[in-house]
Amino acid sequence: MNSFNEKVVLITGAGNGIGRATALAFAKQNASVVVSDINHKDGETTVSLIKEAGGTATFIPCDVSREIEVRALVDGTVEAYGKLDIAFNNAGIEIEQSKLADGDEATYDKIMDINVKGVWLCMKYQIPAMLKQSASAIVNTASIAGLGAAPKMSIYAASKHAVIGLTKSAAVEYGKKGLRVNAVCPAVIETDMFRRAAEGDPKKAEFIKSMHPVGRIGQVEEVAAAVLYLCSENAGFTTGVALPVDGGATAI
């Protein structure tokens, strides 16, 4: 894989899980990484891990559902490093566990504000900065729930379908200007969220694993590797793609 030497990378939701793993992976490839998260402690921890490994990173807190904070995040990135080459819009939430008719408006608004408006706001402010470069790339975190149905998670599924729609639209609108826009669609990945869901319930953990033809859940580093590929020169002819990282789950 190509080195990301001298590239400036902005990652939201980088305080843990997939975001942290991707921040570490970019830093290992010599990128300067702007770590962003709503949780200051988690974000600062990611920066510390990068610096301990010899990398370059800065933390800028951000609630991606707030336009003023997203604008400040992008402006702060350019102020710190002079440009923006790559963005990984990873911040998102998954809180729904009810059938559609049992859902409530507050849950709908919260999921859509972060998962959809957050990605839209990030791209709205990232794109003008990125078009100043000859080649740039955005990757948005969707989900396999954005590729089909997700029982008892209809609002979440709708939000991830929307992320894919935003991704494809941006790819078409800005492709001739050197900007590639793709999405990653993870299945179940071993994160703190998964561990909390399966804690004390071995049968549930085994059932979740069985959903994937490879017989296991994914690792955050595997999603990070997909993101780095999509942002690399090796993926120069790849844009508008929603890439499953799912152990074969969508093949069933």
Which residues fall in each region the model found?
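Substrate-binding pocket helix/loop in short-chain dehydrogenase/reductase
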Residues: S98-L100, D104-K110, I208
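Residue(s) in the substrate-gating loop at a strand-loop-helix junction
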Residues: S143
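C-terminal helical subdomain
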Residues: A183, E206-T238, G247
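Conserved glycine-rich cofactor-binding loop
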Residues: V8, G15-G17, N39
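Short C-terminal tail/terminal secondary-structure segment
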Residues: E94-Q97, G148, L228, T239-I252
